[in-house]
Amino acid sequence: FANSSNENSTPVGLNFSEAKDKYKNDNTMLGIDVSSFQGEVDWEKVKNAGVEFAIIRIGFGYTVNMDLVLDKYFKENLEGAKSQGLKVGVYFYTYANTIEEIEEQAKFISDNLNGEALDLGVTFDWENWNNFQDYQVSFYDLDNMYNNFSSLLKKSGYETMLYGSKFYLNNVWNTKNKNVWLAHYTNMTNYDKDYKIWQFSDKGIVDGINGFVDLDVLYK
């Protein structure tokens, strides 16, 4: 799902079986992240391909009409992944630029999760860097928005994670004491801070999914 700054996308499709050969070991789990862009997913086939976890888009916002939108496949994907025994988390693609908007979005997420158990918590995905100057917020303000998001969701029983590309994790975000989901499309990342998950390709090929899907490795 990443517009991962200037990191190059994987040039050609990467079969999940190849990814397993490269990255699967006793200390890792291999997974995917999905949204309505993937359409209907055959979760049984996904499980049989060797996928161990899925992070599912719960929604996004705001739209130009200032709406918060539930991903139309969110419930179906969450149920499907859980039915196959995959570990699950969700992510929210946010365009928020005030604490008030963060509060509204955290409530939207909590309301739609409605107590649903998550293994991998809720990820905060802010990538609207092209319009950053229009928002008149500082890097400190952005970090404060994440911290508020995290504290609000923890009150609802959910751990949180920060998603970002290598460039922005190094140059914008304060990653100290945060669970980090790194996006860096390369064979071997040289990102040298702590991270929990690495999204290494946006061109994954997985049985049960039409078209490309993001591939991720989780470190136990």
Model-flagged regions — what are they?
Residues 157-170:
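Aromatic-lined carbohydrate-recognition surfaces of secreted/lumenal glycan-active proteins
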